[in-house]
């Protein structure tokens, strides 16, 4: 097969420590890559690379199914999900499966079904991966030309991109269908403390949906992370799904324009770097979403956000001291500001104390107590419901930092419980993964650009000191 560059330029120079270790058709001499370079050995073997990817998908789906069943087996319905270290069941609950009013789990069978379906799927994927890795054709170009490709074939690459975009669009519409027709999804804002409901009044106005993208990412605005109702979330998925599907059709039917042909590097490693860059952005956005957003990630399942736990503490002590006779509207704190309530610089009534920094929190247990100018004093005196008190006391002691007030407290704080919030885990893991994927993006982009520019990449190991040393054994 013709390649874009000489083999010397296309592959880095890497020398095996043990030159006798070889796999037929997959050794360093025939591929230019040592065994530990993994899928790089399969750059020009589309059939074997397909096997590697399908097997990888099988591993991912197997983990999802096994972890799902593990969480079901350990689940205690009497305790909130976020106290049990669960990271998969909260996602299923958010989709409206197995939960009732207030986020209470009423049926774990759907979770069991989900785990089993993933395990069965992983077996199918695993079989396909092993088949294509060991038995199927090494290259697909001859026997299955539709599935074959050459990395530098720009038209074929954009066709593959288009197929991927259509699949992503279909995925977005699956969520829309679930929310509209198949039982609905969990809405933390439903009256009385959250419930599963069908979304009937989708937001499809482009000014609203795309308005989020034009917001500042900082406090009070919060870019797309500030979305606080399911109508906008599901409507956004209608827009996203439509854009992905029409974009996919566009990329299948067209060839890259001249400016795109000039601007991009067209090689396997370049596509890898583009993908890693995109995944990095996804990771950082997911981190912000799960840390700050309590609509897409309801606090009933993931635990409170940091600001939510802090505001819950202020609310809990306001309720307590008001019952003991304190006048919460006028009591002064040690700094001369309001002890329980104060005014923000723009005039709204907000909670006083160190939680003032979180004045822009919106949470379903707190919003009913607001009026046109922030917190409503008469509602705070007469309208507080028992479920709001219970929920705020629970959130106060379950801050995502493992501290009482999520600001300066520590895990040993007297009223806190020793637990790790899934919100912390999901935010931190996605930040770390986003960072490493970004480093991988830079690494592979640099190598791809170097190869395209025609100079050597990788380390020349012909004169490496280790080669002149005695073998370890």
Swiss-Prot record:
| UniProt GO MF annotations | chlorophyll binding; electron transporter, transferring electrons within the cyclic electron transport pathway of photosynthesis activity; metal ion binding
Kindly list the GO CC terms recorded for this protein: chloroplast thylakoid membrane; photosystem II
The residues that hold [CaMn4O5] cluster are 367
Q: Which residues carry this modification: Phosphothreonine?
A: 15
Residues passing through the membrane, by range: 69-93, 134-155, 178-200, 255-275, 291-312, 447-471
Record-linked SUPFAM superfamilies: Photosystem II antenna protein-like
Modified positions (N-acetylthreonine) are 15
Q: Belongs to which family? A: Belongs to the PsbB/PsbC family. PsbC subfamily.
Name under which the protein is recorded: Photosystem II CP43 reaction center protein
This chain's source organism reads Cycas taitungensis
């Amino acid at each position: 097969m013709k390649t874009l560059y000489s083999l010397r330029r296309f592959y880095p120079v890497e020398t095996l420590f043990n030159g006798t270790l070889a796999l037929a058709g997959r050794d360093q001499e025939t591929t230019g890559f040592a065994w530990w370079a993994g899928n790089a050995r399969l750059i020009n073997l589309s059939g074997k690379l397909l096997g590697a990817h399908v097997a990888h998908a099988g591993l991912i789906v197997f983990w999802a199914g096994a972890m799902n069943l593990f969480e079901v087996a350990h689940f205690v319905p009497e305790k909130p999900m976020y106290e049990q270290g669960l990271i998969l069941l909260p996602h299923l609950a958010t989709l409206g499966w197995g939960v009732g009013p207030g986020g209470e789990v009423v049926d774990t069978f759907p979770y069991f079904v989900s785990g089993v379906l993933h395990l069965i799927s992983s077996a199918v994927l695993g079989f396909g991966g092993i088949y294509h890795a060991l038995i199927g054709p090494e290259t697909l170009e001859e026997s299955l030309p539709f599935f074959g490709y050459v990395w530098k074939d720009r038209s074929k690459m954009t066709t593959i991109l288009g197929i991927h975009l259509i699949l992503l669009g279909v995925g977005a519409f699956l969520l829309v269908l679930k929310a509209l027709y198949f039982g609905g999804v969990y809405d933390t804002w439903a009256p009385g403390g959250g419930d599963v409901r069908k979304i009937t009044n989708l937001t499809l106005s482009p000014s609203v949906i795309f308005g989020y993208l034009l917001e500042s990412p900082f406090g009070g605005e919060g870019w797309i992370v500030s979305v606080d109702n399911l109508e906008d979330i599901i409507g956004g998925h209608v827009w996203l799904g439509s854009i992905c599907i029409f974009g996919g059709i566009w990329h299948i039917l067209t060839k890259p324009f001249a400016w795109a042909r000039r601007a991009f590097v067209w090689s396997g490693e370049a596509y890898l770097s583009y993908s890693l860059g995109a995944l990095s952005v996804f990771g950082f956005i997911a981190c912000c979403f799960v840390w700050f957003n309590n609509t897409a990630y309801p606090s009933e399942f993931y635990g409170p956000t940091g600001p939510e736990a802090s505001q819950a503490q202020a609310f809990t002590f306001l309720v307590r001291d008001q019952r003991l006779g304190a006048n919460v509207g006028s009591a002064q704190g040690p700094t001369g500001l309001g002890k329980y309530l104060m005014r923000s610089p723009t005039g709204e009534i907000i909670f006083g104390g160190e939680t003032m920094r979180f004045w822009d929190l919106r949470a379903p247990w707190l919003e009913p107590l607001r009026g046109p100018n922030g917190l409503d004093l008469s509602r705070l005196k007469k309208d507080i419901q028992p479920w709001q008190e219970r929920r705020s006391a629970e959130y106060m002691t379950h801050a995502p930092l493992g501290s009482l007030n999520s600001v300066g407290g520590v895990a040993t704080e007297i009223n806190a419980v020793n637990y790790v919030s899934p919100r912390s885990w999901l935010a931190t893991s996605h930040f770390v993964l986003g960072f490493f994927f970004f480093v991988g993006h830079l690494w592979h982009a640099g190598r791809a650009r170097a190869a395209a520019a025609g100079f050597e990449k990788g380390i020349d190991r012909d004169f490496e000191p280790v080669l002149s040393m005695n073998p370890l054994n």
